[in-house]
């Protein structure tokens, strides 16, 4: 078997729960709930939901329609996908992960419109967060890693954002550590002030903030994320480099970029030649960034795929991988005391702690 590109403990900060579901679990709940899937075998299902050559972001987003109806609105399914997510990450050598999701996309009650063509049920976005928390906590105990969550606002649904920030407040440090904004980057916050208001409330209440920006959208979306939404981290951020002044400013601020190499190839976010990927620029400039999978189910990937791409095509060394993970830990949304513990674990695993030799 090919050896892993980086066989040491890792930290992952940008991965979507609803893009990380085991195909077997989708098939199980589709059968149980009598929901029709495009195929009823793992191989058949993956032919519809997974892909290996670049598609547009719209085509990528359509993949969720194939399987989310089997999971959304089912208590057992929601708990199980959170638990199995922790199991999956533990197997990849991750010791700390922040997983993100939209509570509204898994609900079927008190959500307008009800997603995925579901009939109205009795699972509210609030209960979704509680169910995910239960699954994550159970997974933490079983697999001995730390998992926290980030709740997503959706750019096309600003009416949900107030509730998202309220749920962040309610479950703050009960696995939930931050708020995110995901979706179509062309929908800006001037036209959709609901997001800005939610982020203002997050700032006021000490809730950490990340924003998907500059993935397929221009550098102006990154500028808005930093200046208007007061983002502490940027999801993707590849197109930041197109505005040299903004890029220089964010380097000086030590802004963290959540980089997803394989994802950026498959969504057409970046040039298909990895040697021209913004992450190579980030590496050369000693920027603050991490390596992440984004949506492993749809991209047919594990964290090792992203690390292998970085090693083979972007000139990454073991030392750079260590630096990337230390930066990820430093930029995590954990409370300071837990962050120190996490960093100590990494320093120890990377042989960076000098023995006192009694």
Swiss-Prot record:
GO biological process: adenosine catabolic process; inosine biosynthetic process; nucleotide metabolic process; purine ribonucleoside monophosphate biosynthetic process
InterPro entries, sorted: A/AMP_deam_AS, A_deaminase, A_deaminase_dom, Ado/ade_deaminase, Metal_Hydrolase
Main location group: membrane
Active-site residues from the entry: 215
Binding residues for substrate: 16, 18, 183, 295
GO molecular function, one term: adenosine deaminase activity
Gene3D superfamilies noted in UniProt: Metal-dependent hydrolases (3.20.20.140)
Cofactor (UniProt): Zn(2+)
Positions of Zn(2+) binding: 14, 16, 212, 294
Cofactor remark: Binds 1 zinc ion per subunit.
GO cellular component assignments: anchoring junction; cytoplasmic vesicle lumen; lysosome; plasma membrane
Origin: domain of life: Eukaryota
Catalyzed chemical reaction(s): adenosine + H2O + H(+) = inosine + NH4(+); 2'-deoxyadenosine + H2O + H(+) = 2'-deoxyinosine + NH4(+)
EC code(s) of this entry: 3.5.4.4
Cell compartments where the protein resides: Cell membrane; Cell junction; Cytoplasmic vesicle lumen; Cytoplasm
Keywords: Cell junction, Cell membrane, Cytoplasm, Cytoplasmic vesicle, Hydrolase, Lysosome, Membrane, Metal-binding, Nucleotide metabolism, Zinc
UniProt topology in membrane: Peripheral membrane protein
Job description of the protein: Catalyzes the hydrolytic deamination of adenosine and 2-deoxyadenosine. Plays an important role in purine metabolism and in adenosine homeostasis. Modulates signaling by extracellular adenosine, and so contributes indirectly to cellular signaling events. May act as a positive regulator of T-cell coactivation.
Family note: Belongs to the metallo-dependent hydrolases superfamily. Adenosine and AMP deaminases family.
UniProt-listed HAMAP family: A_deaminase (MF_00540)
Name of the protein described by the UniProt record: Adenosine deaminase
Lineage, top ranks: Eukaryota, Metazoa, Chordata, Craniata, Vertebrata
């Amino acid at each position: 078997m090919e050896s892993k590109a980086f066989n040491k403990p890792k930290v992952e900060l940008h991965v979507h729960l609803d893009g990380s579901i085991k195909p077997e679990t989708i098939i199980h709940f589709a059968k149980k709930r009598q929901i029709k899937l495009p195929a009823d075998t793992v191989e058949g299902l993956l032919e519809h939901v997974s892909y290996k050559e670049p598609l547009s972001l719209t085509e990528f987003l359509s993949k969720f329609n194939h399987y989310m109806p089997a999971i959304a609105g089912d208590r057992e399914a929601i708990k199980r996908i959170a638990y199995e997510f922790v199991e999956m990450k533990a197997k990849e050598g991750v010791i700390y992960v922040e997983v993100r999701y939209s509570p509204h996309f898994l609900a079927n009650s008190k959500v307008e419109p009800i997603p995925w063509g579901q009939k109205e049920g009795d699972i509210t976005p609030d209960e979704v967060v509680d169910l995910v928390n239960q699954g994550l906590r159970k997974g933490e105990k079983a697999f001995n890693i730390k998992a926290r969550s980030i709740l997503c606002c959706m750019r096309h649904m600003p009416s949900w954002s107030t509730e998202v920030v309220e749920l962040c407040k309610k479950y703050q440090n009960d696995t939930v550590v931050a708020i995110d904004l995901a979706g179509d980057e062309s929908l800006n916050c001037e036209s959709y002030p609901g997001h800005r208001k939610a982020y203002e409330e997050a700032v006021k209440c000490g809730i950490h903030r990340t924003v998907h920006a500059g993935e397929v959208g221009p550098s102006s979306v990154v500028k808005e994320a930093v200046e208007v939404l007061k983002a502490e981290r940027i999801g993707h951020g590849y197109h930041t480099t197109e505005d040299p002044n903004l890029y220089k400013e964010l380097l000086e601020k030590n802004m963290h970029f959540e980089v997803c190499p394989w994802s950026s190839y498959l969504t057409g976010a970046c040039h298909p030649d990895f040697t021209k990927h913004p992450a190579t620029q980030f590496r050369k400039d000693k920027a603050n960034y991490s390596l992440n999978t984004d949506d492993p189910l749809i991209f047919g990937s594990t964290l090792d795929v992203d690390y292998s791409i970085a090693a083979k095509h972007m000139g990454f060394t073991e030392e750079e991988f260590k630096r990337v993970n230390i930066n990820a830990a430093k930029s995590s949304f954990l409370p300071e005391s837990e962050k120190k513990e996490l960093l100590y674990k990494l320093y120890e695993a990377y042989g960076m702690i000098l023995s006192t030799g009694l």
